[in-house]
């Protein structure tokens, strides 16, 4: 403070002793909530899953820092451990960091970053969600298991791998919502969500008017349930508004 310059107080104890409960009180502007990230799918999804019940411990002036982005690192550097992520896996990571309001710090070398990852991290819709003025964290609408074929077991032809799907909803400025679906399983699958899980019963007289962030497709009003088919290790993201249900 004596310098007259603004200071960013970034605190780190690698998630020990529940930092989200007291970091704001000591003046931290952002705090590391987990161990160090590695450049692979298991590492970043384990980090996210460890924070799903702590999303409320992040907000204006004190943000949950789930570590740097490994998007586009492609196994380079000292965090390059394990199988290199696919584009869809890196996109999943970036969308989650944006949706959860995580401070966005690149680990990749900007000079050699592949064009598709540069475009991903400059996506204006995703950055707008991350930088939303109200800084509200998302909340978990549903945390579930996907249902995938299990052809090797005649007695149990369908498998339900644990903790492989979740749905998040974030309330944005101007009564807009970001609705996110993740499929963390190793197979393509539907991820299920009832609108009632978001507090929108089918008899409530309202629906969600949805637009796909990745494709730009306007899906129109959706009510009752919306269960997108999602590739393995991938996600879907929609921007939504509440509209009257005229049906």
Model-inferred region functions:
Residues 91, 97-100, 105-107, 157-202:
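Carbohydrate-binding surface patches
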Residues 220-247:
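C-terminal beta-strand-rich structural cap/linker in extracellular carbohydrate-active enzymes
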């Amino acid at each position: 403070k004596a310098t007259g310059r603004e200071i960013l107080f970034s605190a780190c104890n690698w998630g020990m002793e529940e930092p989200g409960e007291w970091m704001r009180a000591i003046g931290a502007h952002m705090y590391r909530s987990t161990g160090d990230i590695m450049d692979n799918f298991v590492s970043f999804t384990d980090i996210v899953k460890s924070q799903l019940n702590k999303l409320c411990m992040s907000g204006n002036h004190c943000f949950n820092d789930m570590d740097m982005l490994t998007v586009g690192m492609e196994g380079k550097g000292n965090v390059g451990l394990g199988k290199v992520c696919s584009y869809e896996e890196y996109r999943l990571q970036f969308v989650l960091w944006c949706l959860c309001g995580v401070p966005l710090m690149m680990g990749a070398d900007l000079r050699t970053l592949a064009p598709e990852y540069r475009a991903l991290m400059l996506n204006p819709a995703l950055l707008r969600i991350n930088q939303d003025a109200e800084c509200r964290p998302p909340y978990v609408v549903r945390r579930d298991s996907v249902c995938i074929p299990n052809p090797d077991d005649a007695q149990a032809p369908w498998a339900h791998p644990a903790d492989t799907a979740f749905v998040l909803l974030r309330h944005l400025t101007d009564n807009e919502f970001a609705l996110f679906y993740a499929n963390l399983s190793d197979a393509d699958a539907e991820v299920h969500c009832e609108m009632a899980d978001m507090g929108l019963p089918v008899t409530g007289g309202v629906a969600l008017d949805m637009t796909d962030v990745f494709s730009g497709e306007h899906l129109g009003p959706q009510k009752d349930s919306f269960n997108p088919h999602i590739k393995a290790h991938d996600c879907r993201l929609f921007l939504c508004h509440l509209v009257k249900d005229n049906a």
